[in-house]
Amino acid sequence: MNYFELFGLVEGFELDTRQLAETYRQLQTQFHPDRFATAPEWEQLAAVQRAAQINDAFTTLKAPLRRAEYLLSLRGTELRGEQQTLQDTAFLMQQLEWRERLADLKGETDPERAIKDFRQEIRHDHQLLMQQLTQALATGEDPRAADCVRKLKFVDKLLEELERFEDSLFES
């Protein structure tokens, strides 16, 4: 089942999130397992399965990276669970610099300010990568879009690590 079709959306990266949420609520109401409590067992099971599909579809489509991965999979490029590394030397160097900078935050005299500045820089790069991803998907440049997804996953993990580091500063 195509998630875009399930929600009555045009297949593409950019979508109307309000329409997605509204259709989700309608589908949840229509296929909620409680509505089938007095139905035969096979119908109850079908309702539970349909509700799970609706939830999976919504979770996938509402998150931009998951939506991009799903869209690429519909086009024949599977990214989930892959172990492929990036061949972009400049981005690999950027990763090393970011990792080094994250490690150096511990020695900063004003770690709160350093974290804020670092987060702002990473978010800016994230925004640029999202723009590149949007353009690549719109123009059918799937290999380029796949690379953007890989890079964005790294950036998201880095932001999570930065959050954990910041939390650890305030726990001490």
Curated annotation (Swiss-Prot):
What processes does the entry annotate via GO biological process terms?
[2Fe-2S] cluster assembly; protein complex oligomerization; protein folding
What are the annotated GO cellular component locations? iron-sulfur cluster transfer complex
Q: Does the keyword Iron-sulfur apply?
A: no
Q: Which InterPro entries match?
A: DnaJ_domain, HscB, HscB_C_sf, HscB_oligo_C, J_dom_sf
Chain ranges of the J domain: 2-74
| A molecular function (GO) term | protein-folding chaperone binding
UniProt keywords, alphabetically: Chaperone
Q: Name one Pfam family in it.
A: HSCB_C
Recorded hits in SUPFAM superfamilies, A to Z, give: Chaperone J-domain, HSC20 (HSCB), C-terminal oligomerisation domain
Q: Which domain of life is it from?
A: Bacteria
- Protein's job: Co-chaperone involved in the maturation of iron-sulfur cluster-containing proteins. Seems to help targeting proteins to be folded toward HscA.
Quote the subunit structure annotation: Interacts with HscA and stimulates its ATPase activity.
Which family, according to UniProt? Belongs to the HscB family.
Q: What's the protein name?
A: Co-chaperone protein HscB homolog
Taxonomy of the source species: Bacteria, Pseudomonadati, Pseudomonadota, Gammaproteobacteria, Aeromonadales
